[in-house]
From Swiss-Prot:
Belongs to the CotF family. Transmembrane segments: none annotated. The lineage of its organism: Bacteria, Bacillati, Bacillota, Bacilli, Bacillales. It is found in: Spore coat. Coiled coil: none annotated. Keywords: Sporulation. Its main location: other. This is Spore coat protein F-like protein YraG. The gene is yraG. It comes from the Bacteria.
C-alpha cells in the first residue's frame, strides 16, 4: 500500500504515544544527573537511546501517513428554536 491514511482515533493515539516517549526521554536524561551508580546510569542511557530510536520510527509513521477526519455535511438539529 503506497498511501496510508490514519483514522482520527489512530492519529490521536499516535500523537499521545509521541508525547509520552518524548517525556520519557526528558525524564531519563534528567534523572541520569541524580544517579551515582554507573550500572544504573548505563541502563538509563540505553533506555534513552532506545526511546530516541522508537521516537524516530513513530515520527516517520506520523509524517508518512495522512490524516482523515470526515466532516459531516448535515448540520445538527438545534435544541432551541
Amino acid at each position: 500500500m503506497d498511501h496510508q491514511t490514519l483514522a482520527a482515533h489512530e492519529a490521536v493515539d499516535l500523537h499521545e504515544i509521541v508525547n509520552f516517549k518524548t517525556l520519557c526521554i526528558a525524564k531519563s536524561k534528567l534523572m541520569q544527573g541524580l544517579v551515582f551508580d554507573q550500572e544504573l546510569k548505563d541502563l538509563m542511557e540505553k533506555d534513552v537511546q532506545q526511546s530516541i530510536q522508537d521516537l524516530t520510527e513513530l515520527q516517520a509513521v506520523y509524517e508518512r501517513a495522512s490524516f482523515q477526519a470526515p466532516v459531516p455535511q448535515s448540520r445538527p438539529t438545534p435544541i432551541i428554536n
